[in-house]
Amino acid sequence: MKTLLIAMMLLALSHAAVGDDHASKLTLEKRQADSVMTVTNVDLGDEVTTISAKGKMGIYGTVYVTYNLTYNADRASGFVTGQGRGAVDKGTVAAGAFRGIWTREGSIVKIRQMVQISDGSQNMDIIDIDMLKDTFVIKAYKVR
Protein backbone atom coordinates (compact mmCIF):
# COMPACT_ATOMS: atom_id res chain seq x y z
CA MET A 1 0.00 0.00 0.00
CA LYS A 2 2.87 2.34 0.87
CA THR A 3 4.44 1.69 -2.54
CA LEU A 4 1.16 2.45 -4.29
CA LEU A 5 0.83 5.74 -2.38
CA ILE A 6 4.38 6.77 -3.28
CA ALA A 7 3.80 5.87 -6.94
CA MET A 8 0.61 7.97 -7.03
CA MET A 9 2.39 10.95 -5.45
CA LEU A 10 5.26 10.71 -7.96
CA LEU A 11 2.79 10.50 -10.82
CA ALA A 12 0.96 13.60 -9.56
CA LEU A 13 4.22 15.54 -9.17
CA SER A 14 5.53 14.50 -12.59
CA HIS A 15 2.39 15.98 -14.19
CA ALA A 16 3.22 19.36 -12.66
CA ALA A 17 6.78 19.19 -14.02
CA VAL A 18 5.66 18.27 -17.54
CA GLY A 19 2.73 20.69 -17.50
CA ASP A 20 4.95 23.76 -17.16
CA ASP A 21 3.27 26.85 -18.59
CA HIS A 22 4.98 26.83 -22.00
CA ALA A 23 2.38 29.05 -23.63
CA SER A 24 3.49 32.09 -21.67
CA LYS A 25 7.05 31.59 -22.98
CA LEU A 26 6.20 31.40 -26.67
CA THR A 27 6.71 34.73 -28.40
CA LEU A 28 6.56 35.40 -32.10
CA GLU A 29 8.31 38.33 -33.72
CA LYS A 30 6.72 39.91 -36.78
CA ARG A 31 8.78 39.56 -39.94
CA GLN A 32 7.32 42.80 -41.30
CA ALA A 33 4.21 44.95 -41.15
CA ASP A 34 0.92 43.22 -41.99
CA SER A 35 0.35 43.00 -45.75
CA VAL A 36 -2.93 43.59 -47.57
CA MET A 37 -3.54 41.25 -50.49
CA THR A 38 -6.16 41.50 -53.25
CA VAL A 39 -7.90 38.32 -54.43
CA THR A 40 -7.39 38.00 -58.20
CA ASN A 41 -9.02 34.61 -58.85
CA VAL A 42 -11.04 31.88 -57.13
CA ASP A 43 -11.45 28.49 -58.82
CA LEU A 44 -13.99 26.33 -56.98
CA GLY A 45 -13.66 22.57 -57.32
CA ASP A 46 -15.11 19.38 -55.90
CA GLU A 47 -11.81 18.36 -54.31
CA VAL A 48 -9.67 21.51 -54.39
CA THR A 49 -10.41 25.23 -54.32
CA THR A 50 -7.67 27.54 -55.58
CA ILE A 51 -7.38 31.16 -54.46
CA SER A 52 -4.88 33.52 -56.11
CA ALA A 53 -3.94 36.98 -54.85
CA LYS A 54 -1.39 39.76 -55.20
CA GLY A 55 -0.16 42.64 -53.10
CA LYS A 56 2.79 44.55 -51.67
CA MET A 57 4.53 42.57 -48.97
CA GLY A 58 7.30 44.62 -47.36
CA ILE A 59 10.70 42.99 -47.84
CA TYR A 60 9.33 40.63 -50.52
CA GLY A 61 8.13 43.43 -52.82
CA THR A 62 5.19 42.78 -55.13
CA VAL A 63 3.95 39.29 -54.27
CA TYR A 64 1.76 36.81 -56.14
CA VAL A 65 0.40 33.82 -54.19
CA THR A 66 -1.76 30.79 -54.90
CA TYR A 67 -3.47 28.75 -52.17
CA ASN A 68 -4.77 25.24 -52.91
CA LEU A 69 -7.35 24.24 -50.30
CA THR A 70 -8.34 20.57 -50.03
CA TYR A 71 -11.42 19.56 -48.06
CA ASN A 72 -11.98 17.41 -44.99
CA ALA A 73 -15.26 15.47 -44.76
CA ASP A 74 -17.00 18.49 -43.17
CA ARG A 75 -16.11 20.65 -46.23
CA ALA A 76 -15.42 23.52 -43.81
CA SER A 77 -11.76 22.71 -43.12
CA GLY A 78 -8.76 20.94 -44.58
CA PHE A 79 -5.20 21.34 -45.68
CA VAL A 80 -3.64 24.16 -47.70
CA THR A 81 -0.56 24.14 -49.91
CA GLY A 82 0.72 26.79 -52.22
CA GLN A 83 3.41 28.91 -53.78
CA GLY A 84 4.35 32.55 -53.78
CA ARG A 85 6.73 34.76 -55.73
CA GLY A 86 7.91 38.20 -54.72
CA ALA A 87 9.62 40.67 -57.04
CA VAL A 88 12.02 42.27 -54.57
CA ASP A 89 13.82 44.44 -57.13
CA LYS A 90 14.72 44.42 -60.84
CA GLY A 91 17.05 41.43 -60.48
CA THR A 92 15.69 39.54 -57.47
CA VAL A 93 12.64 37.32 -57.12
CA ALA A 94 12.00 35.48 -53.85
CA ALA A 95 10.13 32.17 -53.98
CA GLY A 96 8.14 30.59 -51.19
CA ALA A 97 6.31 27.32 -50.65
CA PHE A 98 3.83 26.77 -47.84
CA ARG A 99 1.71 24.14 -46.14
CA GLY A 100 -0.82 24.41 -43.39
CA ILE A 101 -4.41 24.05 -42.35
CA TRP A 102 -7.56 26.02 -43.04
CA THR A 103 -10.94 26.32 -41.40
CA ARG A 104 -14.06 28.24 -42.34
CA GLU A 105 -16.13 30.12 -39.79
CA GLY A 106 -19.10 31.67 -41.52
CA SER A 107 -17.73 33.70 -44.43
CA ILE A 108 -14.17 33.82 -43.01
CA VAL A 109 -11.54 31.34 -44.25
CA LYS A 110 -8.75 31.08 -41.66
CA ILE A 111 -5.37 29.84 -42.91
CA ARG A 112 -2.48 28.97 -40.60
CA GLN A 113 0.62 27.96 -42.52
CA MET A 114 4.37 27.48 -42.40
CA VAL A 115 6.35 29.11 -45.22
CA GLN A 116 9.79 28.15 -46.54
CA ILE A 117 11.38 31.02 -48.50
CA SER A 118 14.19 30.72 -51.06
CA ASP A 119 16.56 32.85 -48.95
CA GLY A 120 16.40 30.22 -46.18
CA SER A 121 14.03 32.13 -43.92
CA GLN A 122 10.84 30.58 -42.57
CA ASN A 123 7.60 32.28 -41.57
CA MET A 124 4.42 31.32 -39.83
CA ASP A 125 1.56 33.14 -41.56
CA ILE A 126 -1.82 33.91 -40.08
CA ILE A 127 -4.38 34.76 -42.75
CA ASP A 128 -8.11 35.50 -42.46
CA ILE A 129 -9.86 35.76 -45.82
CA ASP A 130 -13.25 37.48 -45.67
CA MET A 131 -15.19 35.94 -48.54
CA LEU A 132 -17.44 39.03 -48.66
CA LYS A 133 -14.45 41.24 -49.59
CA ASP A 134 -11.75 40.98 -52.24
CA THR A 135 -8.90 41.68 -49.82
CA PHE A 136 -7.25 39.99 -46.86
CA VAL A 137 -4.31 40.55 -44.53
CA ILE A 138 -1.24 38.34 -44.12
CA LYS A 139 0.44 38.47 -40.71
CA ALA A 140 3.94 37.01 -41.12
CA TYR A 141 5.95 35.92 -38.07
CA LYS A 142 9.60 34.82 -37.96
CA VAL A 143 10.31 31.16 -37.39
CA ARG A 144 13.85 31.23 -38.77
Model features per residue range: what roles?
Residues 18-144:
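Beta-strand-enriched cores of mature, soluble protein domains
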Residues 1-5:
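Positively charged n-region of N-terminal signal peptides that target proteins for export
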Residues 6-7, 17:
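Cleavable N-terminal signal peptides
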